[in-house]
């Protein structure tokens, strides 16, 4: 039978014309070269209820990890004959594939922190992540680190806000976060207003305001209304000087503050005014002062403290320093090459503007930036060809780093948006917690307050109606639960109140005022006479909630008692 079983596949192959019919059974199959060793065995790994099977030699490829070393024996379950790990089974699937294929992949849908924790638990370094996933992993890692840093700084800022005891610390926080207090917000808007006034005055003073008396040419407004513009400039400089001195006083590290970019801008913006006060009317010195007044335009950079978009743009340019350096280097190299070629292509033309290679720089820059002023135009065919190639090269060179800059700007912008959103959510959450605490506290004490008010009204002889009781939130919940109980049990429950005189009263009837002398037995008798056996059973179950426990206690304390009981109505 075994020979027939061995012959049948061979005969089937011969029937379709593959090989001729053989008279002998098939030989034994050859031993595969990659057949596993006899000491290899199949291992069963249970990860949070999900079982994985693999070979021992597969795990021992990486002996420096947890699964590849003898440390895995600490997780071996003798009863189930398996290794048990209380970890994430979805991430473990990628870890096991790393042992099988030698390539570690990063799943984009998984949490980065959980993924790193699983790798650290199994002793796998994140550096072995494959090239196909490493860029995504690195970007997610950077974004997560920035997000955690923002949260940490925000938490530290909130904690430091409670610990601010020094005036310098309070002033510095007011300068950096003007929305923390009203005074800081007012100073923030005042400085912004004077920055705008200073910039506008610097522009308007150059506008012509008439002709010079006895001279040719126009007279600018800065000279015609010199006193007005001087007063405006003085007021603005005084505000800027006070702001700079206050920031310098409140800075945690004054040396670091002085070396910062914004500090240098503040100094450059106010120094021309003070230098101008000490300059005489000498023409040479006045000419130098006019040149120095150009630095007043740097006051516009002070708006970066008042504009989040400008700060994001600055952070973007700072993060794209390498890409911008590549752009400048590429443009400089292309300008030199095309200017040299253009000079030799146009130097033999009479009256040409390309008199030298530096003179051709202007044409190359204008052409590569696609401006094309037309003041310098090539006349030879070779020069026109070079100009066309120069224009196309400029488009390509400038367009290459633009996507990187845009992506960085978008990343930083969304990061700031997420930070602002988290701050708003944190404030809203704290506000909800405060409201919940206040509401819950008011709800808990409302019962006590209502009871005290009821006692005071009864002692003064005022009859209470149901509207007064309905104002209590617990009474409303009580009646709501009664209605739900009636719907579910198809029974009607009546609330009977035992007033001071011992007479049962339904909720709709007025509450009579009488002496507090009554007993628990009389109340029980009234309930039994009113509702019979059901009331008796209900009274025995609910008697422990009555205000007084016995006649002896009532007579001893001589305190008024009342109570409300639920009975099943039998009509």
From Swiss-Prot:
Co-expressed with SIDL in the nervous system. GO terms for biological process: action potential; associative learning; chemical synaptic transmission; potassium ion transmembrane transport; potassium ion transport; protein homooligomerization. A motif (Selectivity filter) lies at residues 370-375. It is found in: Membrane; Cell projection, Dendrite; Perikaryon. The chain crosses the membrane at residues 186-204, 229-250, 261-282, 290-308, 324-345, 385-406. Its main location: membrane. Residues 500-520 are annotated as: Disordered. GO terms for cellular component: dendrite; membrane; perikaryon; plasma membrane; synapse; voltage-gated potassium channel complex. It is a multi-pass membrane protein. The N-terminus may be important in determining the rate of inactivation of the channel while the tail may play a role in modulation of channel activity and/or targeting of the channel to specific subcellular compartments. Heterotetramer of potassium channel proteins. Interacts (via C-terminal dendritic targeting motif) with SIDL. Mediates the voltage-dependent potassium ion permeability of excitable membranes. Assuming opened or closed conformations in response to the voltage difference across the membrane, the protein forms a potassium-selective channel through which potassium ions may pass in accordance with their electrochemical gradient. May play a role in the nervous system and in the regulation of beating frequency in pacemaker cells. The segment S4 is probably the voltage-sensor and is characterized by a series of positively charged amino acids at every third position. This is Potassium voltage-gated channel protein Shal. It comes from Drosophila melanogaster.
């Amino acid at each position: 039978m075994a020979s027939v079983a061995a012959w049948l596949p061979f005969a089937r192959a011969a029937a379709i014309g593959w090989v001729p019919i053989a008279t002998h059974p098939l030989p034994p199959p050859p031993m595969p070269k990659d057949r596993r060793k006899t000491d290899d065995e199949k291992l069963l790994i249970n990860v949070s209820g999900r079982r994985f099977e693999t070979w021992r030699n597969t795990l021992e490829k990486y002996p420096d990890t947890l699964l590849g070393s003898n440390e895995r024996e600490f997780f071996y379950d003798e009863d189930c004959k398996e290794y048990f790990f209380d970890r994430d089974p979805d991430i473990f699937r990628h870890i096991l594939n790393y042992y099988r294929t030698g390539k570690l992949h990063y799943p984009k849908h998984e949490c980065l922190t959980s993924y790193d924790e699983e790798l650290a638990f199994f002793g796998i370094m994140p550096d072995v992540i494959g090239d196909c996933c490493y860029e995504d992993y690195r970007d997610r890692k950077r974004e997560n680190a920035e997000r955690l840093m923002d949260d940490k700084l925000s938490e530290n800022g909130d904690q430091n806000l409670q610990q601010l005891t020094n005036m310098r610390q309070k002033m510095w926080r007011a300068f950096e976060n003007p929305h923390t207090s009203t005074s800081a917000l007012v100073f923030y808007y005042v400085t912004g207003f004077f920055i705008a006034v200073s910039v506008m005055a610097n522009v308007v003073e150059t506008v012509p305001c008439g002709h010079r008396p006895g001279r040719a040419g126009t007279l600018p407004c800065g000279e015609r209304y010199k006193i007005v513009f001087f007063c405006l400039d003085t007021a603005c400089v005084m505000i800027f000087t006070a702001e700079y001195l206050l920031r310098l006083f409140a800075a945690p590290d004054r040396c670091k503050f002085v070396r910062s970019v914004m500090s240098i801008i503040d100094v450059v913006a106010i120094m021309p005014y003070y230098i101008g006060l000490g300059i005489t009317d000498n023409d040479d010195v006045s000419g130098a002062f006019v040149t120095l007044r150009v630095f007043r335009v740097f006051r516009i950079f002070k708006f970066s403290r008042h504009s989040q978009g400008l700060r994001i743009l600055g952070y973007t340019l700072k993060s794209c320093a390498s890409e911008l350096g590549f752009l400048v280097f590429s443009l400089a190299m292309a300008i030199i090459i095309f200017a040299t070629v253009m000079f030799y292509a146009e130097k033999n033309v009479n009256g040409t503007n390309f008199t030298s290679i530096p003179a051709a720089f202007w044409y190359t820059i204008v052409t590569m930036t696609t401006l094309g002023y037309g003041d310098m135009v090539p006349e030879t065919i070779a020069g026109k060809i070079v100009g066309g190639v120069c224009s196309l090269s400029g488009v390509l060179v400038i367009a290459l780093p633009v996507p990187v800059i845009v992506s960085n700007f978008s990343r930083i912008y969304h990061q700031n948006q997420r930070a602002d959103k988290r701050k708003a959510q944190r404030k809203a959450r704290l506000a909800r917690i405060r409201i919940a605490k206040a509401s819950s506290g008011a709800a808990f004490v409302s019962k006590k307050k209502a009871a005290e008010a009821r006692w005071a009204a009864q002692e003064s002889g005022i009859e209470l109606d149901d509207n007064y009781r309905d104002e209590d939130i617990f009474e409303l919940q009580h009646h709501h639960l009664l209605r739900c109980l009636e719907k579910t049990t198809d029974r009607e429950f009546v609330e009977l109140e035992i007033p001071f005189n011992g007479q049962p009263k339904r909720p709709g009837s007025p509450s009579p005022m009488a002496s507090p002398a009554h007993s628990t037995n009389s109340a029980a008798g009234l309930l039994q006479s009113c509702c019979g056996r059901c009331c008796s059973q209900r009274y025995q179950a609910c008697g422990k909630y009555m205000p007084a426990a016995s006649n002896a206690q009532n007579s001893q304390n001589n305190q008024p008692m009342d109570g409300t009981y639920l009975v099943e109505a039998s009509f």
